[in-house]
Amino acid sequence: MPNEATPAEVVEIIGRTGMTGEATTVKVRVLAGRDQGRIIARNVLGPVRVGDILMLMETAREAKKLSIR
């Protein structure tokens, strides 16, 4: 079942990132799967707020800080 997404809840909004501020860095808590309960940082495009549920295709990768120019 490698094509299934894993739900994750947004617990904190860290800030805007990217060259023009187009992405938002958030901390999410993985709700299911082998990484259940783990909190990771992810970059999100589009509107997002605390409490939203994101469907992640991959839970092993963490977001790095994108440069702002």
Swiss-Prot record:
Gene Ontology biological process terms, A to Z: maturation of SSU-rRNA; ribosomal small subunit assembly; translation
GO cellular component, one term: cytosolic small ribosomal subunit
Pfam families: Ribosomal_S28e
Gene3D superfamilies referenced in this protein's UniProt entry, alphabetically: Nucleic acid-binding proteins
UniProt xrefs under SUPFAM superfamilies: Nucleic acid-binding proteins
Cysteines paired by S-S bonds: none
InterPro entries associated with the record: NA-bd_OB-fold, Ribosomal_eS28, Ribosomal_eS28_CS
UniProt xrefs under PROSITE patterns: RIBOSOMAL_S28E
Keyword set, alphabetical order: Ribonucleoprotein, Ribosomal protein
Keyword flag Thylakoid: no
Record flagged with keyword ATP-binding: no
GO molecular function: structural constituent of ribosome
Similarity comment: family membership: Belongs to the eukaryotic ribosomal protein eS28 family.
Annotated protein name in UniProt: Small ribosomal subunit protein eS28
Species assigned in the record: Thermoplasma acidophilum (strain ATCC 25905 / DSM 1728 / JCM 9062 / NBRC 15155 / AMRC-C165)
